[in-house]
From Swiss-Prot:
It comes from Medicago sativa (Alfalfa). The keyword Membrane applies. This is Trans-cinnamate 4-monooxygenase. The gene is CYP73A3. GO terms for molecular function: heme binding; iron ion binding; trans-cinnamate 4-monooxygenase activity. The lineage of its organism: Eukaryota, Viridiplantae, Streptophyta, Embryophyta, Tracheophyta. It is found in: Membrane. It catalyses: (E)-cinnamate + reduced [NADPH--hemoprotein reductase] + O2 = (E)-4-coumarate + oxidized [NADPH--hemoprotein reductase] + H2O + H(+). (E)-cinnamate binds at R213, S214, R215, L216, A217, Q218, A307. Pathway: Phenylpropanoid metabolism; trans-4-coumarate biosynthesis; trans-4-coumarate from trans-cinnamate: step 1/1. Induction: By fungal elicitor. Its cofactor is heme.
Length: 506
C-alpha cells in the first residue's frame, strides 16, 4: 500500500510539473536557443547524458551539435562553447555579462555561498576579494620574495629521492613527496610555515581533509540533486558529509594557522627576516580595516588550499608522467639545461627564460593535460545573445578549454605530446591567453591569477628533477599509465604511478 501511494505521489508530481513547464513555455519569453538534444519534461537531457559531464564527453557532443550547444539538465540550462571565437566572446568581449559564477549545492557549502573569491558572483564583493588577494599572492614581487623557498623545496625533493635507495631500483610514488612540497610552497607564502615531513600529524590531518573536500566537490554523484530540485532530499546524507568536512577544515584553518598568526602578531613582529609580510598578514590587515570579515579570511585560505595547491600538483604530476613516457623529450630537456646552465648548476627562477625547450614542455603539458579543462563555470545574470542564440539568464556556461588546443582543425596532430610545436608553428602562443586556441588559465576578468606562481613552480620542480635524476618507468614496464580522471572541472591522473628515479653523476 505504501509503495502504491509513493508511485501515485511521484506520478502526480510528474504530471503537475509537466503542466507547469508547458504553461511556462506558452506564457514565457520565446528564445532562439542553441542546438542540442530534445529534453524531456522534468529531467531534461539528464536521463540520456547522465552525471559525467567531463571534457571528453562534452567534446563528443560538440562534434554532434556544433561549437555552441545547450543541454537542459533537469531544471538547469547548461551551455557549452567549444571554439576560440566563442571562448573570446564569453571570456573577453562579453566578460561582464558572463562574468558571474553558477550556484551549486555542494560548492555553496564549501564556499559559504560565495564568500570566497573564486566562486562568488561578479560584483563588488568579487572586486574587493580579488584586490585583497592580489598583493599577497599574485604579483611578481611575491615571486621574487618566495622563489628561494620554492628552489629550496625542490632541492629537498631531489635530495629525498636521491637518498631513497628504493627509488633507483623498484621505484617510488613520487607524487606523495611532491604533494608535501606543494603544501610547503603555499604555506610558506600564506603563513611563513612549512611541514618537516609527510608524517607531520598536522599535515596528515590537513591533507586528509583537503582530499575529502576535493573528492566530494569534484564528484559527479550529486549532479542529479543539483539539476532536479525535487530529488534534492535524496542528497541529504551527501550534503551532511560536505558540511561536516567544511566545518572541520575551517576550524583547522582557524585554530592552527589564522589564530596562531594573530597570537604571534600580538607578541612580536610577524615580518620575516627580510622585513616582508606573509600573505595572511595582508589579509588580516584588510580584516582590521573592516573590508572583510572572519569568514572571508577562512574562505580565502580555503581557495588557496584547493585552487593553488591541487591544480599545480596535478600539472607537475602530468609533466613527469609525460617525460617518463617520452625519454627522448626528457633527454632534450636535460641536454638543454646542461648546455645552457652548465652541468651541476641547479636551475633557478631567473634561469627559466633561458630554457625555451623546458618552457615548451610545460606549455605542452598544460595543453594536452589541462588541470581545469572546462575552466571554472561561468554564469550570465541576464539574457544575452551568443553567436545569434539567446542564452537564458542564470545558465551555466562551460568553456571547453581542453578542446580548443586539442581540436585537429586548429592544431597539428594534437593527440601527440610534442613540445616542439611551441618552438615551431605555435611559437607565438603563450599560456597567458594571448591566443584563444590555448587557455590553460582562462583569460579576462575571471581568469586564474595563479598563473604567475604556477609557471615558475612547474619550471623549477620539473627542471630540478630532470637535472638530477633519470625518470623511468618501473621494472618490466615500457610506459606508465596516463589514464585520466575527470571531475566537475578537474583533470588529474587516474593512478599515481611508481617511477624509477636514478641519480645522475656530474
Amino acid at each position: 500500500m505504501d509503495l502504491l501511494l509513493l508511485e501515485k505521489t511521484l506520478l502526480a508530481l510528474f504530471i503537475a510539473a509537466t503542466i507547469a513547464v508547458t504553461i511556462s513555455k506558452l506564457r514565457g519569453k520565446r528564445f532562439k536557443l542553441p542546438p542540442g538534444p530534445i529534453p524531456v519534461p522534468i529531467f531534461g537531457y539528464w536521463l540520456q547524458v547522465g552525471d559525467d559531464l567531463n571534457h571528453r564527453n562534452l567534446t563528443d557532443y560538440a562534434k554532434r551539435f556544433g561549437e555552441i550547444f545547450l543541454l537542459r539538465m533537469g531544471q538547469r540550462n547548461l551551455v557549452v562553447v567549444s571554439s576560440p571565437e566563442l571562448a573570446k566572446e564569453v571570456l573577453h568581449t562579453q566578460c561582464v555579462e558572463f562574468g558571474s559564477r553558477t550556484r551549486n549545492v555542494v560548492f555553496d557549502i564549501f564556499t559559504g555561498k560565495g564568500q570566497d573569491m573564486v566562486f562568488t558572483v561578479y560584483g563588488e564583493h568579487w572586486r574587493k576579494m580579488r584586490r585583497i588577494m592580489t598583493v599577497p599572492f599574485f604579483t611578481n614581487k611575491v615571486v621574487q620574495q618566495y622563489r628561494y623557498g620554492w628552489e629550496s623545496e625542490a632541492e629537498s625533493v631531489v635530495n629525498d629521492v636521491k637518498n631513497n635507495a628504493e627509488a633507483s631500483v623498484g621505484g617510488i610514488v613520487i607524487r606523495k613527496r611532491l604533494q608535501l612540497m606543494m603544501y610547503n610552497i603555499m604555506y610558506r607564502i600564506m603563513f611563513d610555515r612549512r611541514f618537516e615531513s609527510e608524517e607531520d600529524p598536522l599535515f596528515v590531518k590537513l591533507k586528509a581533509l583537503n582530499g575529502e573536500r576535493s573528492r566530494l566537490a569534484q564528484s559527479f554523484e550529486y549532479n542529479y540533486g543539483d539539476f532536479i530540485p525535487i530529488l534534492r532530499p535524496f542528497l541529504k546524507g551527501y550534503l551532511k558529509v560536505c558540511k561536516e568536512v567544511k566545518d572541520r577544515r575551517l576550524q583547522l584553518f582557524k585554530d592552527y594557522f589564522v589564530d596562531e598568526r594573530k597570537k604571534l602578531e600580538s607578541t612580536k613582529s610577524t615580518t620575516s627576516n627580510d622585513g616582508l609580510k606573509c600573505a595572511i598578514d595582508h589579509i588580516l590587515d584588510a580584516q582590521k580595516k573592516g573590508e572583510i570579515n572572519d569568514d572571508n579570511v577562512l574562505y580565502i585560505v580555503e581557495n588557496i588550499n584547493v585552487a593553488a595547491i591541487e591544480t599545480t600538483l596535478w600539472s607537475i604530476e602530468w609533466g613527469i608522467a609525460e617525460l617518463v613516457n617520452h625519454q627522448d623529450i626528457q633527454n632534450k630537456v636535460r641536454e638543454e639545461m646542461d648546455r645552457v646552465l652548465g652541468p651541476g648548476h641547479q636551475v633557478t627562477e631567473p634561469d627559466l627564460h633561458k630554457l625555451p625547450y623546458l618552457q615548451a614542455v610545460i606549455k605542452e603539458t598544460l595543453r594536452l593535460r589541462m588541470a581545469i579543462p572546462l575552466l571554472v563555470p561561468h554564469m550570465n545574470l541576464h539574457d544575452p545573445k551568443l553567436n545569434g542564440f539567446d542564452i537564458p539568464a542564470e545558465s551555466k556556461i562551460l568553456v571547453n578549454a581542453w578542446w580548443l588546443p586539442n581540436n585537429p582543425a586548429h592544431w597539428k596532430k594534437p593527440e601527440e605530446f610534442r613540445p616542439e610545436r611551441f618552438l615551431e608553428e605555435e611559437s607565438h602562443v603563450e599560456a597567458n591567453g594571448n591566443d584563444f586556441r590555448y587557455l590553460p588559465f582562462g583569460v579576462g576578468r575571471r581568469s586564474c591569477p595563479g598563473i604567475i606562481l604556477a609557471l615558475p613552480i612547474l619550471g623549477i620542480t620539473i627542471g630540478r628533477l630532470v637535472q638530477n635524476v633519470e625518470l623511468l618507468p618501473p621494472p618490466g614496464q615500457s610506459k606508465i599509465d596516463t589514464s585520466e580522471k575527470g571531475g566537475q572541472f578537474s583533470l588529474h591522473i587516474l593512478k599515481h604511478s611508481t617511477i624509477v628515479a636514478k641519480p645522475r653523476s656530474f
